[in-house]
Amino acid sequence: MMLISGDIFDRAYSRESYQAVYRALESVQVPVFISPGNHDYVSMTSPWVTEKWPANVTVFTREKLTKKQISGATVWGAAFLAPEAPSLLEGFRAEPEEGFAIGILHGDTTQAKSPYCPVTAGQIRESGLHYLALGHIHEAGALQVGDTLCAWPGCPMGTGYDETGEKGVRIVELGQTVTSRFVPLNTPRFYDLETTVADDPVAAVAKLLPAAGNQDFYRITLTGASEALDLSKLQNKFSHFPNLILRDQTVPPVDPWQAVGEDSFEGTYFTLLQENLHSGDSEQQRIAQLAAVISRQLLDGGEVKLP
């Protein structure tokens, strides 16, 4: 069976997106159970009410957990009826049935007072379920509470640069024990990266990217001291990465020794530092150079950025 714990649609949906989801669900040819979440909650205008769904699909449309029996298992599920929902697992315990007891909810285990169907360890323990499939949390995770395994896959694909890394699904096997494993999907991924430009911005960007282009989404922030960058020209160097965004947060290079020789406190200070730069050992020279850079940044009223 396939369990989908909500948010297939992100609020509004189009005819094309409905038809694509319909065809995909019909093609799997196994029972599919859906628990609508806070983004695609059940309402008089939601696709769960207004549209037809394949015969192999069961959509839970009540805020109270209800059951659907199939061969070897009973599946319990509920739905959001608004953008927020109370704890739908509170006070629930599965009735003794033949086979496995499986639950599916769009719920949040991270906050006891979450407005998105908070799920607590105590509720999981008392549920009488063998397995509880959750949605809502976009990072994959799992916890065993008593006799119940509770797990969530995250999301099959990130939707922005706050959802980086591997995304995928969970495969759960029910037997004498219940086991779960995360399976990454070959969907485009998001990467939010940063690099110091130094003298070669092309090399700085290239070291963060794979050799061959792909459809992944890269946002690379360029930092450090640099002459003015031509981002358009730099972007063209990496045209084989169509989803690459470059952000310029470099600062103009500043000579930390520019005050040497001035008849001022500042000039005297940097002159003394420079004497250490020329007369000390390599460690003293490193410290003197670093002190000059930091001092220059502070005196110029800028943010301290270590070289």
What are these regions (language model features)?
Residues 15-22, 115-123, 235-236:
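Charged helix-capping and loop-helix junction motifs
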Residues 6-7, 37-38, 106, 135-136, ...:
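Active-site glycine-centered loops adjacent to acidic/histidine catalytic or metal-binding residues
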Residues 1-66:
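Core catalytic region of metal-dependent phosphoesterases/phosphodiesterases
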Residues 40-122, 155-156, 184, 197:
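Conserved catalytic scaffold of divalent metal-dependent phosphoesterases
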Residues 114-177:
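Conserved beta-sheet core of the metallophosphoesterase superfamily
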Residues 176-307:
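Accessory, non-catalytic peripheral segments of nucleic-acid enzymes
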Residues 1-20, 97, 292-307:
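N-terminal active-site segment of His-dependent metallophosphoesterases
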Residues 28-32, 99, 129, 147-148:
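A short helix->loop->beta-strand "cap" motif at the edges of active sites that frequently abuts
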